[in-house]
Amino acid sequence: MCSVTGVLILNPHNYKEIEKKLAKILIRAEDRGRDSFGIVVIQKDGSTKSSKHVGKPSLQEEKLYGILDENSKVVIANNRAEPTTEYVRRKTENDIQPFEGERFVVTHNGIIANDMELEKKYKVSKLSRIDSSVLPPVLDRSWNGNLDSLSEILNSIRGSFALVIGDKKNPDRIFIAQNFKPVYMMYDRDLGAVFFTSLDDYFDATELDNVTKLDPYSVVMVDDKLEIRKVPLLKEKNKKRILVVASGGLDSTVAATYLVRQGHEVTLLHFNYHHKAEEKEREAVRKISEYLNVPFVEIDTDLFKIVGHSTLIKGSSGEIVKDRKGEEGAEFAHEWVPARNLIFFSVALAMAEAYGFDAIASGINLEEAGAYPDNEMEFVRMFSRLVPYAVGPNKKVEVLMPVGNLVKHEIVKLGVQIDAPLHLTWSCYEGGNKHCGKCGPCYMRKVAFEVNGLKDPVEYEA
């Protein structure tokens, strides 16, 4: 495994300071690569200079300097942790990344499982025993330097990769390609350079520095005019198969209905987790699935009964908070269930990957984000960023929040507009014959209908 590093130099007069920053990055990157390090510099005229060495850069710091000059344009570098399956007892310069072809210079983090197949397909030979060394000959043979055509070649790779690529014919630009292996970008305005590396920690950036995580499964080109172009490696679908985590309440029901009305293929996923309203929610979701004419999957779990520490679970010692006619329960997470949405999302993600769904969705919304951290839009955004590292290679599962930016009365309004089966929903934390009318969800529901001047179609206890 490796850390990949690249630099696009915009102001060559600052080459000495740029070199110092590069050296610091490579030393910090030792935790992803201790066995060797290499630097290849592409000059303004397309010629190259290189420095490759066995061992840690921190123990040979002098070899990190004296490489750049006023004509340097692009730097491609690598720190390598030699995989057990590719251990080379006596390494030569040919076994050290970056690898240099006739036109392209490549540094690679990951494993290419089909390197021998690529040799046959493109009729090339590896530059070394290392799998990564197949890439420069493949690119030399089949790539014209156009961003769009690069994605087609990369999709023939079976394995993992983060690539930083330099083009000797066009030393005014740098390319970054990745599936699930990470690459970060930092623009140093003062130095006049754009830096790339595998972890943002290696930049030693401050809060005011411009650091960006590049999207997984993308190919990016940055040129010396600071133009950035990006193309995805995975195709986007207009009509999606979506697995909706459905409780039977207002929010997830409106979310599911909205997706159905958008033309997507929706399946409802419901969890029976020994909560007090389990039977009523289960009944509601079944009726909602019939109304929307969509499949319904349910999962029974004892996990939250084992975790405990929530008044929402059957047999708990506490009671549902009903102070101030339910307003107290609406404004604070008294009925918090530890890590519930994280677990629900994780199970939904596993099922989505296994059964070929394109996305998962839920009824997470702005109203309940005021009390519950795992209803915050940021929770969904952060989980979405985690997904490429939680599913298999070349799998894409989106995380959607159709009502994420709406408050409760807006959700009710939208539900009426799209003919969502609000009359079939169950919002109450209790599992009685009717809504209790006094818990937090009941309070929010009643107020939401009142704001819209509508009669709530469900019944409440007197």
Swiss-Prot record:
UniProt binding sites for Zn(2+): 428, 436, 439, 442
Binding residues for ATP: 246-256
Keywords from the named record: ATP-binding, Glutamine amidotransferase, Ligase, Metal-binding, Nucleotide-binding, Zinc
Active site (record annotation): 2 (for gatase activity)
Pathways involved: Purine metabolism; 7-cyano-7-deazaguanine biosynthesis
One protein family per Pfam: GATase_7
CDD domains named among the record's database cross-references: Gn_AT_II (cd00352), QueC-like (cd01995)
Co-factor(s): Zn(2+)
Domain named Glutamine amidotransferase type-2: residues: 2-225
UniProt keyword Transcription regulation, yes or no: no
MF GO annotations: ATP binding; ligase activity, forming carbon-nitrogen bonds; zinc ion binding
Enzyme class (EC, first level): ligase
Keyword ATP-binding part of the UniProt annotation: yes
Entry's cofactor comment: Binds 1 zinc ion per subunit.
Catalytic activity: 7-carboxy-7-deazaguanine + NH4(+) + ATP = 7-cyano-7-deazaguanine + ADP + phosphate + H2O + H(+)
EC code: 6.3.4.20
Assigned protein family: Belongs to the QueC family.
Matches recorded under PANTHER family: 7-CYANO-7-DEAZAGUANINE SYNTHASE (PTHR42914:SF1)
Function: Catalyzes the ATP-dependent conversion of 7-carboxy-7-deazaguanine (CDG) to 7-cyano-7-deazaguanine (preQ(0)).
Cited HAMAP family: QueC
Protein name (database record): 7-cyano-7-deazaguanine synthase
Organism: Sulfolobus acidocaldarius (strain ATCC 33909 / DSM 639 / JCM 8929 / NBRC 15157 / NCIMB 11770)
